[in-house]
Amino acid sequence: MSKMTFTPRRAALLAGISIGSMMVGGHAMAQDAATASQAAPADDEAAIVVTGVRASLSSAQSIKRNSDVIVDSIVAEDIGKLPDRNVAEALQRIPGIQVQRQYGEGSSVAIRGLTQVRTELNGRDIFTASGANQLSLEDIPSELLAGIDVYKNPSADLIEDQLSGTINFRTRKPFDFDGFKAAATLTQSHFDLVDKFKPSASLLLSDRWETGIGEIGILASVSYQKTAFRQDTISTEPFYTLDPSVPADAAVLDTLGRTGQTTTLPHGTGIGQVYGDRRRLGTDISVQWRPSDTLELTAEVFRSDYKFRLDDYSFFAYTSTSAIVPQPGAPFTYADNGDFQSGTFIDLPIGDNTSAQTRRSKTTDYSLNLNWKATPNLTISADGQYVDATTKNLRSIFGLNGTADTLYQNISGSVPVVNIGSSTGLTNPATYDSAFYLDNLNESKASDKTARLDAEYRFDAGILSSIKAGLRFADRRNKTIDTGYRYTGLSSIPTDLETVNLDDFFRGDADLFGNIIAFKRGIIRNYQATLDTLGIASAPSYVQSGTNQQLQKTYTGYATAFFKADPVDGNIGVRVVRTDLDVSGYYQQTPIIIDENGNETNGPTVFNPIAVSRSYTSVLPSLNLRIHLTDDLQLRLAAAKNISRPSFTQLNPSLTITEPGSAQQDQVHSTSGGNPYLKPMKSDNLDASLEWYFSRTGSLTAAAFYKRIKNYIQTAVSTRNVTFENGDSYNYEVTSYNNVATGKVKGFELAYQQFFDFLPGPLSGLGMQANFTYVDSKAPSPATAGPVTDVPLELLSKYNYNIVGIYELGGLSARVAYNWRSKYVVTTAGNGTGNLPIFNEPFGQLDASMSYNVTPQFALTLDGVNLTNTRRATYFGIDTRPRDVVVNDRRISLTARISY
């Protein structure tokens, strides 16, 4: 366990100083404290051992203070104890980081407004086999980590492809401990909405020995974690506008009593209820060998095995143009801008879906490092790594179609009212006239072979303190296969149905329509049982158009000079990287064939291979300066260029085109695909940070940043003319990715942390962390039809803050943490947005934990997440067009921790 010491005399000195004088007169206070410390004879005083939260914050502050670049860190309080049990939620406490949640858990993050985040494990690549270039943060068990470092600006010795920053996950090594170490945790968690208990456990064993061939250390760590969730959603989408200048729309407006008035109506509304669970199994084995004082070898195998499963019910009513029929005598109500607010529709189609989804991801990282101090001044490091990752996904959907008598909808309140009525009953199979089944399977496999050689030479005197240079080669491969969605129309309504009780839906706070019917959960969860029940012979086959292979090789060299000329130190360097990219896929065309009776059928599908090869070289200079204004006050200035390569999903060249039949001639034809010709995004970065460290765990920092991003990748819709073999041509709206924009991101961060040791008695255990981030961004949004407008970057809140109250004294520690972020754009390319982006409303969440050390080796911890049951909501650009409202679980966990 990491330990720090300070003297009682210094504690007494700090106890006599108020918070106000500390914050205003910090320089003088720091000098006095240093003088007192030097004057105190250590032999006459008993040292106070600092552990737990204080040691964690002190270690993180030390990393930030002494780093060559701008970095923020999280350090585990003890083995298996990050401040938050979810990795993404731990990261959200860092200034400049915003988290995205999926089914109640943090799943991904953005750094300073950008989602192009690089993920590393102990300074090396780590990723999930998927369309992204990074690790899914859901996959990592937090118990395996010693800490997390977030690099916010680059230096030449850091690996490129970090447009927003790099997140480096650090694991423990056997030489981190003085000798034998054993630690274990056992956790039981309750998830209140789904009302389930789930266990978690972790174990670490480590030891080191002197042998005839040198010192050897072995560490083995394993973590097993299960969680459950339920998510309830009320949705309204999409919205369509009726234009009185369009004859067809004008006729509908006449029936609504809205003649000559532009009016917007919802064309779909309903509810969804999702049940699921996650299972994380992580293992880490590390072996270190130090044959001499100048040579050290480290071998490590890290494995993450993640399982995700859900099944859900959804029930929707569709108010299409032909079904916009108000109930007689009950006219619709509208907002002042013409947006629908409430009313009753009659005789409208309904859909009742039951679905299941599974994901299994495995990532295994093999690494070997040699560190050799060749001379007192020269250190050489050689590093090799192999990563193997796989992901398998399955989606299975059973659907019923029918007709409802009425739909009452009121979207004017904070919780929309959805009330669907049927004279035959929504739980009666006779209400439904048809059924269908959809299934899809896809697999991804990725690998990375990396070799790296670094050398650093330190100078004994002069301005130049050291020179560091290195070479790196990486061979990254990614392959995806996909069946596409297979549609199976069912000849009759199956009998394997059950009633779903919705009495406690939305915690009982929703005005709802009662129970529904669904395909049996016990069957839909089992894919083969579902196929057997529905009489489907086998799973769908993988199709050529679902096959995408990509090979990316990078060749890198860098050189960095580190210098020091009091009061300034820093580094200047350049990184040069060549990227060779090979992308392949298939272009699929399916024509329409008309037989002698005039019947239309799909003709034979034609698959045309697509192969694209590209190379480009990037030159990435960087400069980092640190100016020591006083012993405790420093100013950092940084400038750098960086790149972010397109993701594998964005580069996927495969495209599927189906010729429209006669009934679809006048409809808009659309498809989607990637773009293998995308360029990497390039950024020019300027950073500044003013940092005041007034105690071991006390600091006040302010940082400002500016990024200008060229070749910004966005979703865009373009019109493409497609000619089929019969000579017929059609225009298709193709949704893809383009380098269409120059984006700008600027902002600042404020952060403060302190323990109030000067307070008397038990109050001296109080402490606080607080940070605030402001990010302003602009980029053109050409994703939908209509004029191009400037909107904030997707998933970026302009404001977010964290306030954390801390208490630690004796064996008791506690923490209450509140995280808040302002509204943000979810997407600019949503269904039926009317050229308006989808926004997430402002969102805040309260979490807390309390821990007590029963003995020096045994502790109990109580954690609570989402204590206030916060609702999340989205809307279509303006407040009168709500999209959905979501509730998730509150989680309470009790952990027993033992360490020797």
Predicted features by range, described:
Residues 36, 88-125:
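Extracytoplasmic beta-strand/coil segments of soluble accessory domains associated
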Residues 49-80, 107-108, 124, 129:
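N-terminal periplasmic "start-of-domain" segments of outer-membrane beta-barrel proteins
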Residues 194-324, 330-335, 359-369, 374, ...:
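Transmembrane beta-barrel wall of Gram-negative outer-membrane proteins
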Residues 348, 355, 359-363, 546, ...:
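Outer-membrane beta-barrel signature, preferentially recognizing the C-terminal barrel domain
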